[in-house]
Amino acid sequence: MLAFCRSSLKSKKYIIILLALAAIAGLGTHAAWSSNGLPRIDNKTLARLAQQHPVVVLFRHAERCDRSTNQCLSDKTGITVKGTQDARELGNAFSADIPDFDLYSSNTVRTIQSATWFSAGKKLTVDKRLLQCGNEIYSAIKDLQSKAPDKNIVIFTHNHCLTYIAKDKRDATFKPDYLDGLVMHVEKGKVYLDGEFVNH
């Protein structure tokens, strides 16, 4: 009888531990996924991914001047002063964990300015292909990756590009705000979407 009681108590303890672990796992899973169904990838997670394989991070440009009442940096087709501050803050946080990357942008004033303020002096390459947002963008990404297979890549592009990629790769509805991003990688000639970048 005593042995049975001990066994029963052990079983109850085991069940309680399992339930607690399941609850923790459930919370972790909830926190690790965005409401749109994309995995959330913060700076530290991105750094761990970059140790496994080079990453490609695509950002939407910073706040547009022509759609804001905030002060413009310069050209009306560019970004606002607030946009430059936001881009610099994001760049500082990003570079703390991923210091080594090649930098690209589409050929618009707003993406060029965003990339410039993000990078704080890093060489920027402008590529007009990054304005095209169908399957062409995958070809562009693979081409850029092939030039430096071991380097991480940061690309400044547009909301419709990010929306297209999320829908095409994971059937997710992604409506990016300014400076929101997606994390991808190239493997054996294919481009994969890992998740949504979250600057935490």
UniProtKB/Swiss-Prot annotation:
Pathway: Bacterial outer membrane biogenesis; lipopolysaccharide metabolism. It is an enzyme of class 3 (hydrolase). Keywords: Hydrolase, Periplasm, Signal. Residues 1-25 form the signal peptide. Its main location: periplasm. SUPFAM superfamilies: Phosphoglycerate mutase-like. Pfam families: His_Phos_1 (PF00300). One of its GO terms (molecular function) is phosphatase activity. Its EC number is 3.1.3.-. It is found in: Periplasm. Induction: Induced by BasR. Expression is significantly induced in the presence of zinc. One of its GO terms (biological process) is lipopolysaccharide metabolic process. GO terms for cellular component: periplasmic space. Catalyzes the dephosphorylation of heptose(II) of the outer membrane lipopolysaccharide core. Belongs to the phosphoglycerate mutase family. Ais subfamily. This is Lipopolysaccharide core heptose(II)-phosphate phosphatase. The gene is ais.
